UniProtKB/Swiss-Prot annotation:
It is an enzyme of class 2 (transferase). The gene is rpoA. This is DNA-directed RNA polymerase subunit alpha. GO terms for molecular function: DNA binding; DNA-directed RNA polymerase activity; protein dimerization activity. The keyword Nucleotidyltransferase applies. GO terms for cellular component: cytoplasm; DNA-directed RNA polymerase complex. It comes from Chlorobium luteolum (strain DSM 273 / BCRC 81028 / 2530). One of its GO terms (biological process) is DNA-templated transcription. It catalyses: RNA(n) + a ribonucleoside 5'-triphosphate = RNA(n+1) + diphosphate.
Length: 328
């Protein structure tokens, strides 16, 4: 007989304190020791593994290194860099982009002046102060913005080919401002040695607390699945079965690498996928339905059309395609 471990029926939400940027989540009852185990896992993944958008570098006219001062600007480059690290974005782009700004004085340069040239991102903390440009002066600055996870120091975020005067910035990608958890005792029947784990999550507004813990949970689940599916004994296959398995694997990999434009889709669906930077069938099936519906101009009609196309290949949304080692 397998011992049945005590598990939470559901995750409770503290509705009294819940906002778009803060959430308190309660998991109970848990077996002794699992409060700390789950709390640590969630905290680490939330802080280090969730994707986000950040400024990765700048280029200022007339400036050739990061310790310079800028004529007609009150702040020097190190102060401006420190302020730019605090800018928070909401973005669905996967690739890096650049925006060019020309700030004419007299003016306080704020984060709201950083505008996407093609709508790739939105600044969330628009009132954040960056610098003051004096009367009669102009600050011409290129701002480089990228996607990533957690935190990447400046020396690791430098692109392979940099323009002269490019200044790399420590990129704080994580959309999570703060995470903490506490473990308390809780009662089940007559037993009082079970645990309750309380998880507090604060985000920068680019993702809700609910979505952040859901994404963190999926990341953890994808990793522990390898252990759950582990078998110490290898099945014996005939040479013919091995060949058939290899052929099926290669067929699936080629299918997942098929370009979206090769599908028989409406112009509207093609445009929606292009704007979402979904280039291959593999990119598409790795997304969940609710994730697609969050993209701009992507509606249920487009979703139904895509479902019908995927069903032709016996594919579906939300597939785990990591084993096929997709190439760019």
């Amino acid at each position: 007989m397998i011992y049945q471990m005590q598990m939470p029926a559901k995750i409770e939400v503290d509705e009294a304190t819940h906002t778009d940027q803060y959430g308190r989540f309660i998991a109970q009852p848990l077996e002794r020791g699992y409060g700390v185990t789950l709390g640590n896992m969630m905290r680490r993944v939330l802080l280090a593994s969730l994707p986000g958008t950040a400024i990765t570098g700048i280029k200022v006219d007339g400036v050739f290194h990061e310790f310079s001062s800028i004529e007609g600007v009150r702040e020097d480059v190190p102060e401006i860099v420190l302020n730019l690290k605090k800018v928070r974005f909401k973005s669905t782009c996967k690739r890096s982009c650049k925006t060019t700004l020309s700030i004419v004085g007299p003016k306080d340069f704020t984060a709201g002046d950083i505008v996407a040239q093609e709508g790739e991102f939105e600044v969330l903390n628009k009132d954040l102060y960056i610098a003051t440009v004096n009367e009669g002066s102009t600050l011409n600055i290129d701002v480089y913005i990228g996607r990533g996870r957690g935190y990447t120091p400046a020396e690791e975020s430098r692109p392979d080919s940099m323009p002269i005067g490019y200044i790399a910035i420590d990129a704080i990608y994580t959309p999570i401002r703060n995470v903490k958890f506490a473990v308390e005792n809780t009662r089940v029947g007559q037993r009082t040695d079970y645990e309750k784990m309380v998880l507090d999550v604060e985000t920068d507004g680019s993702i809700t607390p609910d979505d952040s813990i859901s994404l963190a949970g999926r990341i953890i689940n994808e990793h522990v699945t390898f252990f759950a599916n582990f078998s110490p004994t290898e099945e014996e296959f005939t040479e013919e079965e091995y060949k058939q398995q290899d052929d099926e694997f290669e067929t699936m990999r080629r299918l997942l690498n098929t370009k979206i434009e090769d599908l028989d889709l409406s112009v509207r669906s093609h445009n929606c996928l292009r704007l979402a930077e979904i280039d291959t069938i593999g990119d598409l099936v790795s997304r969940k339905e609710d994730e697609l519906l969050n993209y701009k101009n992507f509606g249920k009609k487009s979703l139904t059309e895509l479902k019908e196309q995927l069903e032709k290949f016996e594919l579906k949304f939300g597939m785990d395609i990591t084993r096929y080692q997709m190439k760019g």
